[in-house]
Amino acid sequence: MAKHQVNYTANGGLPIVLTTVDRLVQWGRSNSLWALSYGLACCAIEMMASGASRYDFDRFGTIFRASPRHSEVMIIAGTLTKKHAEFTRRLYDQMPEPKWVISMGSCANTGGMFNTYSTVQGVDRIIPVDIYLPGCAPRPETLQYALMILQKKIRRQSAFRAQGVKRLEA
């Protein structure tokens, strides 16, 4: 038994859990992240490798989806061109709240080596980004670590106040 563990039991010796609704909702959200895989260049290959059995993102509750309406996390992997910028914004707007964005790779973060008239110099100029993954191309382990950081970030947020739900006064 752990040092500070307290075992509460109710009428008949059944264990009970003491927590808040906010923590319960955030635990559920953080452990069932459905990601929109939005691969634009080389980083998409590493993102696809992360969905294979070797890295097994399913054990963290991360499932890749093709529809933005079924996703909470958008992973943008690769170079974003100005031609794709409006489409990227539209996909982001179609995602339900709450939503998070991971910018994967140097090209998505800052435009990378493609400093041209047709390249967006960072995804954060189009949509808000929560986590930046550096590298060319980041390994699947790095993406896995970023998802674990995102899970911690989600658990720290309030489930209801972030969406504008106000407390009712009696």
UniProtKB/Swiss-Prot annotation:
Catalyzed reaction equations: a quinone + NADH + 5 H(+)(in) = a quinol + NAD(+) + 4 H(+)(out)
Needed cofactors: [4Fe-4S] cluster
Biological processes, Gene Ontology terms: aerobic respiration; electron transport coupled proton transport
Cell location: Cell inner membrane
Gene3D superfamilies noted in UniProt: 3.40.50.12280
GO cellular component term, pick one: respiratory chain complex I
InterPro entries: NADH_UbQ_OxRdtase-like_20kDa, NADH_UQ_OxRdtase_20Kd_su
SUPFAM superfamilies linked to this entry: HydA/Nqo6-like
Protein function: NDH-1 shuttles electrons from NADH, via FMN and iron-sulfur (Fe-S) centers, to quinones in the respiratory chain. The immediate electron acceptor for the enzyme in this species is believed to be ubiquinone. Couples the redox reaction to proton translocation (for every two electrons transferred, four hydrogen ions are translocated across the cytoplasmic membrane), and thus conserves the redox energy in a proton gradient.
Record family assignment: Belongs to the complex I 20 kDa subunit family.
Protein name listed in UniProt: NADH-quinone oxidoreductase subunit B
Organism (species): Campylobacter curvus (strain 525.92)
